[in-house]
């Protein structure tokens, strides 16, 4: 399982929810396994680029007109996790070419890892708009009885394998 997103994106497959049912918010904690392509760089070995790791996934189904607001909410949740740990971080809006084909918008939250000479992603938040809903036939019945596709969003919790080195490095004392 590379991420819980695939399973969470199918919860309402072939269903029609009402406006009152939305938003639906899910959190999932799963072990993840990935074969990381292009992960052979010397600065991304060890804990920072593991093939097996645990991850919390945030997932949300929402009304199309609430999609941007829900996206900002997920970004804020991820940023608050990083702020709570006192990290130096930045939030980066990915260019369209760097987003997966299914995502309309993605922000990466990156923390400073001085020994790696820069920032590394610890969370990613994306808005698929109606892409996943169309593929899964997940719709919402509006108050006027019309039916349209809902929007889906997801975000990863902190990548613990990258948080640990940053915790050590950003909290070192001279003694």
Annotate each predicted stretch with a short phrase:
Residues 1-175:
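TRNA-recognition modules of translation machinery and tRNA-sensing kinases, especially anticodon-binding
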């Amino acid at each position: 399982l590379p991420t819980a997103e695939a399973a969470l994106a199918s919860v309402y497959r072939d269903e029609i929810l009402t406006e009152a049912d939305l938003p639906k918010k899910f959190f999932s904690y799963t072990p993840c396994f990935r074969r990381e392509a292009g992960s052979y760089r010397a600065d991304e070995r060890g804990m920072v680029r593991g093939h097996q790791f645990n991850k919390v996934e945030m997932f949300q189904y929402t009304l199309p007109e609430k999609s941007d607001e829900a996206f900002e909410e997920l970004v804020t949740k991820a940023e608050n996790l990083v702020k709570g740990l006192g990290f130096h971080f930045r939030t980066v809006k990915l260019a369209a070419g760097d987003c997966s084909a299914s995502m309309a918008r993605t922000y990466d939250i990156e923390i400073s890892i001085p020994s790696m000479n820069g920032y590394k992603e610890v969370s990613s938040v994306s808005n698929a708009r109606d892409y996943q809903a169309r593929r899964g036939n997940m719709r919402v019945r509006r108050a006027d009885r019309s039916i349209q596709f809902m929007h889906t969003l997801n975000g990863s919790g902190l990548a613990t394998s990258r948080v640990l080195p940053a915790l050590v490095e950003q909290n070192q004392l001279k003694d």
